[in-house]
Amino acid sequence: MATRRLMLLGAPGAGKGTQAQLLMQELGLPQVSTGDILRAAVKEGTPLGLEAQSYMNRGALVPDAVVVGLIEDRLARPDAGGGWILDGFPRTPAQAEALDGLLAHLAQSLEAVVLIDVPEAQLIERLTGRRTCPLCKRIFHVRFNPPPAAPPFCTDHTDCPSELVQRPDDTLEVVSKRLNVYRESTEPLIRYYQEQQKLTSVDGDRSPEVVYSELRELLG
């Protein structure tokens, strides 16, 4: 039987979002993203959403207990009963232990943790090479998906500005910091799931189609 409850790990730029979308399309599983859950709860004005907003408004980290509560609410919904793809949580071993507890409470289990492994030099090239249209937010890449030589850059409007922009998050300085944070927080998490014998990895330094083919083979 195919794996139906899984987690994707990987550094920024590894392609987790792309692979999650492909899995969603083929398997019909919901992607459970902490960012999406937080935004939805705040918008809906749920008790946990309001509590999370109180921290976010101060620029503080939302406590683990609040995030775990939001994830538990999401995993308890009917569309997640047949499986899910967890993205963005946990980020630390403490959060992983909390996840184990809530899954036990829901009588569910995490069946597989897949690490999409990409060399750091390739991650930096992927992230720093992105360029965005400031009007429609379409994303190009100076190497992998170069824009037209001259405007209009986008097919859905003809009033593109003369230059695309690099988002602040995609500068070399910020990308390097994001990768440092990822290494510090995720390496203990990788060991945590290795000890549970749930971790497997795929080489993410290939085309999305090739990575997905190996991912599906691993999941059965």
From Swiss-Prot:
The protein's UniProt keywords, in alphabetical order, are: ATP-binding, Cytoplasm, Kinase, Metal-binding, Nucleotide biosynthesis, Nucleotide-binding, Transferase, Zinc
Primary localisation category = cytoplasm
Regions crossing the membrane: none
- State the GO CC annotations: cytoplasm; cytosol
UniProt GO molecular function = adenylate kinase activity; ATP binding; metal ion binding; nucleoside diphosphate kinase activity
Q: Which residues bind Zn(2+)?
A: C133, C136, D156, C160
**Disulphide bridges in this chain?**
none
Keyword Metal-binding (UniProt): yes
Chain residue ranges for the region called NMP: 33-62
**Stretches the record annotates as LID:** 129-170
Its EC top class is transferase
Entries under PROSITE patterns matching the protein: ADENYLATE_KINASE (PS00113)
- Domain comment text? Consists of three domains, a large central CORE domain and two small peripheral domains, NMPbind and LID, which undergo movements during catalysis. The LID domain closes over the site of phosphoryl transfer upon ATP binding. Assembling and dissambling the active center during each catalytic cycle provides an effective means to prevent ATP hydrolysis. Some bacteria have evolved a zinc-coordinating structure that stabilizes the LID domain.
* Family classification: Belongs to the adenylate kinase family.
Complexes and interactors? Monomer.
Q: Which NCBIfam families match?
A: adk, PRK00279.1-2, PRK00279.1-3, PRK14527.1
Name of the featured protein: Adenylate kinase
Gene source species: Gloeobacter violaceus (strain ATCC 29082 / PCC 7421)
Gene symbol here is: adk
